[in-house]
Amino acid sequence: MALKHFKPVTPGLRQLVIVDRSGLYKGKPVKTLTEGKSSSGGRNNNGRITVRFRGGGHKQTYRLVDFKRAKRDVSATVERLEYDPNRTAFIALIKYEDGELAYILAPQRLAVGDKVIAGEQVDVKPGNAAPLSNLPVGTIVHNVEMKIGKGGQIARSAGSYAQIVGRDQGYVIVRLNSGEQRLIHGACYATVGAVSNPDHMNTSLGKAGRSRWLGVKPHNRGVTMNPVDHPHGGGEGRTSGGRHPVTPWGKPTKGMKTRSNKATDKFIVTSRHKRKK
């Protein structure tokens, strides 16, 4: 789908670039495949802000997307492509031969009327899901499982994908968009193709209000605050902070590594930081 630019008849339209969604279904989602969703406003169960600059935004209904593709060897037809406010990608409503409906992530080049299937042996075409070990090396995949049967976790946002680059003793080597290469068990399922809406990265919100519709509030810099609020706060007039950049909690920012070592590090074949050197 193409990008839409607008005549600058108002200041908010001057910078606005959005994805043309005219090809998507215009009605409401399937009610049995939706749930209510209450926004947290960045607060935890104690009512304290745990994520700053969140709140407001348009009310959303959660669509129950099938990341597991647990219904195996049953063909399904794509009924329609839909917008989903909870993610950057589009979703596809599929109808199995037995009449059951489900939502899946829509891959690129999936059209209404296409047939999709999940199983051990499937054709390598967009929307079909299979174990990684049964897909040929070089295949572009998305919605990749990290644990058998847990459901896809890798490559789910708009335009993202991973690529199978090799095999090793029951595991499959997968290259991610970040440049990282990981070992993933061959029995983990993945869906063929790249995720839909690749133009999402080229959009421009155009005005602050559009950010507010998404539930994002203004982000304040530390140097504009008072000393009680931030280590960079205070001073007479405008200051540069007077120290190396830190978070509101006093920890160095700008490049300090915060990731702790995990037992699963052994599955990382090539770090995403390797290519930066």
UniProtKB/Swiss-Prot annotation:
GO terms for biological process: cytoplasmic translation. GO terms for cellular component: large ribosomal subunit. Keywords: Ribonucleoprotein, Ribosomal protein, RNA-binding, rRNA-binding. Pfam families: Ribosomal_L2 (PF00181), Ribosomal_L2_C (PF03947). GO terms for molecular function: rRNA binding; structural constituent of ribosome; transferase activity. It comes from the Bacteria. Residues 223-277 are annotated as: Disordered. Belongs to the universal ribosomal protein uL2 family. HAMAP family: Ribosomal_uL2_B. One of the primary rRNA binding proteins. Required for association of the 30S and 50S subunits to form the 70S ribosome, for tRNA binding and peptide bond formation. It has been suggested to have peptidyltransferase activity; this is somewhat controversial. Makes several contacts with the 16S rRNA in the 70S ribosome. Part of the 50S ribosomal subunit. Forms a bridge to the 30S subunit in the 70S ribosome. This is Large ribosomal subunit protein uL2. It comes from Azorhizobium caulinodans (strain ATCC 43989 / DSM 5975 / JCM 20966 / LMG 6465 / NBRC 14845 / NCIMB 13405 / ORS 571).
